[in-house]
Amino acid sequence: MKLYYTTFKSPVGEILATRTENVLNFITFPKSTWQRFFSALKKDENIDLKKDEKKFSSLKKTFKPYFAGKKVKFKESLDLTGGTPFQKRVWKTMLKIPYGQTKSYGWLARQVGGKNKARAVGYACGANPIPIVIPCHRVIREDGGLGGYGGGLSIKRKLLKIEGAKI
């Protein structure tokens, strides 16, 4: 399988993104996570990894105004095949959280049919393969606390501040 990647600078650090010919399938930051990612890919002989800036031009054009604090709509097709059915429901529901707003883990659990599954929702957020585009940073604790974030709470806070969310 051909897998394309790019890297680019952002206010939250350098971002690594991957895609197949048709779909965006992975975003990671900060840069300290890249080594683990590349090591895992090298073990899979079926993956042909190639850097290709052109395949990400639309994504980069969308990120630029996003990081400038403008509301944008990411238009990439997303590959969610790596998730469980529950995770996919959580990720698709997160896509509906409006820019600049936050929702609680409990709210998200109720939306996906499990009012007592806030912890499971938190794990699904942590397993999100395409952060920012799938806005897991908009999910916070019921008491208004930030909760967790794979990129670290300072990055979560920064993303919410960029969006003008009240935290």
Model-assigned labels for residue ranges:
Residues M1-G114, I162, K166-I167:
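Basic nucleic-acid-binding alpha-helical/helix-turn surface characteristic of O6-alkylguanine DNA
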Residues M94, V121-A127:
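Major-groove recognition helix of helix-turn-helix-like DNA-binding domains
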Residues G114, A118-V121:
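Helix-turn-helix DNA-binding helix
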